[in-house]
Amino acid sequence: MGPVPFAGQGRYGLAAMAILTQHTPREAREPRGFAGGIASLADDQLYALQNPFALDGRVSSYPASARGFAVANSYLLTQPDAAMLIDTGFGKDEPVIRAQIESLIAPGLPLSMFPLRLNEFMSINNVESFAGHFNVETCYTSNIDAALWFDFGAKAEGRDILKSMKVTAVTRADTIELGKDGRAIDVMQAPIRLIATRWLYDRATRTLFSSDMFTHIWRDTATGPWIVTDADNDPTSLRGVRSFMLNTRYWWLEGAPTDSIRRGIGNVFDKYDIETIAPGYGCILRGRNVVERHYRMLDEFLKSCDKSVAVSRYVTRDEER
């Protein structure tokens, strides 16, 4: 699927990249352009920390033929007395992401981290660095020995930081409470996954953090915009979603038993009131109509792939569908 053009600012007043409200510190409101940006998804509650990367055929998360730019998304959930970072970003972006976090929370504020994909760089690359720089209260993971996964050539002090970092293991169906007011964040095993993955749902902002799913929209330029809203003329098609899925890590779905996957995803959308889908990379989907449309396209794609109607076959390395 080709890049999706922007069709104007949405009714939420977000021009997607580095646009914040007057209540946010000045340094956080200033556009960061090619160096990344901050998007306020809910004032004083949820921010997307966005840092672009080029699509030049070397990024396995996108089809080999994709050209343009995508964006790695980290998310900062904030309360007056605590904050949580979802995914820590690529190591190349560590200084920028660190500055983004510093612009949004007070020094010393308790910070928790939750990398949703334990074996993917854009999720875990900066755990050790941030644990050493911020007042990290805990790191939520699906694996109690996850600290062993976060050592990317760290020096002795880095390894000591990881050893002393508190790790909180979460189950496949759990709830985290953020801050003394107990802001509820529901944890679930991703109903569609290739690697160990969790999805989260933030009740306060009605946001589903979908990790490596719903990542199928990229742009022509590094400046985005990186949010699709109800007001946009979003040209994403079922054919485009199908091509994206079959030319990335979910190439194996054609001819697989997808009915159970469809039921799992459907249960999530039936259970939760979702106004925003916040993927780990690619454009954020914002607004009930946008969310519903992209969910339906994914469901139709999965339906067409089921073994009852499709045949599994060998796919060569360079073949695109």
Where are these regions (language model features)?
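Active-site-proximal beta-strand elements of phosphoester/diester hydrolases
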Residues: Q45-N51, L85-D87, A184-Q189, L208-D212
